[in-house]
Amino acid sequence: MITGKLITVEGPDGAGKTTVLEQLIPLLKQKVAQEILTTREPGGVAISEYIRELILDINHTAMDPKTELLLYIAARRQHLVEKVLPALEAGQLVFIDRFIDSSVAYQGAGRGLIKADIQWLNEFATDGLEPDLTLYFDVPSEIGLARINANQQREVNRLDLETIEIHQRVRKGYLALAKEHPKRIVTIDATKPLKEVVSVALEHVLALLLA
């Protein structure tokens, strides 16, 4: 039985969501006694991390969009049963850096795959599990890509080679999802100063936990 809460973190490339999450968790630990787990997709467990390497390998430019989607779905399933569900059943507060919405935004809006097919695969992989809250960090594609290019410490992966048009379609896909699920997805302006973005995210998380 699930007694914990699931919060997912989403955003286009360069939105800074991972950095926000790194700063958010220590602040949250000062305010709640609940045990907190942070993890990521694709990855989080050994099998899923191996799949992550396949997906992001810069040499795999011939990867078909459906192959890419199915790899993400496989990684999602293994991660869920091995790590996420046990934590939720133990009453933990679980944060996942990317989840079901990423597939709809990237492989759906970005790659042009059929949304209904992606939603079916998501439901198949998760047994219908949905986040209690999704923090969507929004940033224009031009700003996001500029941030990525400015980060010299970040290793370039296959997805960094995509055109700005694909990144723009991904963002539009996310914005459409936010309109479709207004009770679950909160949109946060990620162009604001980092401290302000973290503060807004913290407010939304605490509102969920104290509801």
UniProtKB/Swiss-Prot annotation:
Listed GO CC annotations? cytosol
Q: Its Gene Ontology molecular function terms?
A: ATP binding; dTMP kinase activity
Q: Which CDD domains match?
A: TMPK
One Pfam annotation, family name? Thymidylate_kin
Q: Which reaction does it catalyse?
A: dTMP + ATP = dTDP + ADP
Which positions bind ATP? G11, P12, D13, G14, A15, G16, K17, T18
Q: In the UniProt record, does the keyword Kinase occur?
A: yes
InterPro entries linked:
P-loop_NTPase (IPR027417), Thymidylate_kin-like_dom (IPR039430), Thymidylate_kinase (IPR018094)
Q: What keywords sit in the KW lines?
A: ATP-binding, Kinase, Nucleotide biosynthesis, Nucleotide-binding, Transferase
**Chloroplast among keywords:** no
Could you tell me the Gene Ontology terms of the biological process aspect for this record? dTDP biosynthetic process; dTTP biosynthetic process; dUDP biosynthetic process
* Record-listed E.C. numbers: 2.7.4.9
Q: Which family does it belong to?
A: Belongs to the thymidylate kinase family.
Q: What does this protein do?
A: Phosphorylation of dTMP to form dTDP in both de novo and salvage pathways of dTTP synthesis.
Record-given protein name: Thymidylate kinase
Taxonomic classification: Bacteria, Bacillati, Bacillota, Bacilli, Lactobacillales
